[in-house]
Amino acid sequence: MVVPTLLAALLTLAPVGEAAVPAIAATAVIDLVVLGGIWLAMRPGAPDVRSAAELDRFRHAGRPVLVELYSNFCLICMATRQVLKAAATDLGANCQIVRVELPTAGGREIAGAYRILYTPSFLVFDAHGDLVRTIIPDTITPLANGYRVLDETGAFVSRLHRISEEDLVRLVRRAA
């Protein structure tokens, strides 16, 4: 959006030269404001869990828990937000969905405990609080390489090309 607008301004403004500089600068500022607004609207927002102790309270509440480990600067995390909302609607009160921001102190503590390196990653706990599934990006570029689903021992179970509402709901229902 920014580049085409700037390019259009550069190509269509007359006169060219010093007189065009204010118009180009104004266009650049408008583009940055619009882009910033879009980014703010898509950000995943505040985490539900800020420490391992908080996560433990959710884990031992007597129902399955789906944990998303995300980053506010991760574009895939932003896209996954709608998938999580749809999964939450499908699962209703049968499951708790919580989010952990990875680049925080609590997020790093939780990520270290479960060997999470990249976002978005997901942990599925059963109603007893036991980890039953981990969904992690295969590499830092999950759009290209997909995700690995691991069991409670860390053994490979299956591969997902992308995170879908159906996959999340199925994994959580299996944990119930």
Per-segment meaning from a language model:
Residues 113-117:
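A short glycine-leucine-enriched loop at secondary-structure breakpoints
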Residues 47-56:
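Alpha-helical transmembrane signal-anchor/signal-peptide segments
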Residues 69, 92-108:
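Thiol-based oxidoreductase modules, predominantly thioredoxin-like and allied folds used
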Residues 118, 123-176:
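Non-catalytic, surface beta->alpha helical segment in thiol-disulfide oxidoreductase systems
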Residues 78-91:
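Typically the conserved alpha-helix immediately C-terminal to a functionally engaged Cys/Sec
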Residues 60-73:
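Short active-site neighborhood of thiol/selenol oxidoreductases, capturing the structured segment around
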Residues 74-77, 122:
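The canonical Cys-X-X-Cys-His
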Residues 1-48:
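N-terminal targeting signals for export/organelle localization
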